[in-house]
Amino acid sequence: MADLISVVGTVILMMIVDFKKMAVEFKRFFGLDSTQNFPALSIVENKLCQTDTNFEFNVIADVDWNCKDSVQAYYRHCASLHEICIKESVYEKARSGDRSALYSIAHEISHWGLINYFKLNLGVKEFEQLDPVSKVVLMNIHENIADLLTSLLVFSEEELLKAKSAGDFDFSSCMGKDQISLALFYCQNHQILAENFINKIVPQLMAQNRQTELKRRIG
């Protein structure tokens, strides 16, 4: 049930939020134009520290890695600490240009951006007070949209669609199957999703609100 709700929640966000514009704006925030590559390692080592006084970037020795939820890197958000941690072996791969390692770092930067820059925190402040199912749902949705934002930062929409049709790039070298599917689904459908939200869902919500207000007044 939690997985199904997470999928629905992710699609609703795709209808409401223009993630393509979000990726362009996030690049601009780091002084990049929309066509430039996303230098994840440089950003996490230098620019985030300059931008966020609460930010820390830590490389952890493989033998000391104890995060059960991630095998490569993670983002931790507290009131006075915004921390990206990465396993040492993954960090060394990123320094050598490994696409999978760089994608992992970009993914954690996306988490930072969603919470701190775009303020799309999805209840992070009240997270510990949530019931177990709600926690799973919010975590899944946040992972999904971080994956989507990362894909649009690292690759252009044109690259994703071209590679899908021509098969000229192996996205599996840096992305999982679910991440690829999510990015392609958004690139192929984001305009339709947005139009449906504006033309169908918004009028329904407004009609519902009017009906609720009418009942309240009559009552």
Q: Model-predicted segments: where are they?
A:
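Active-site hotspot residues in diverse enzymes, especially metal/ion-binding acidic/histidine motifs
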Residues: 1-219
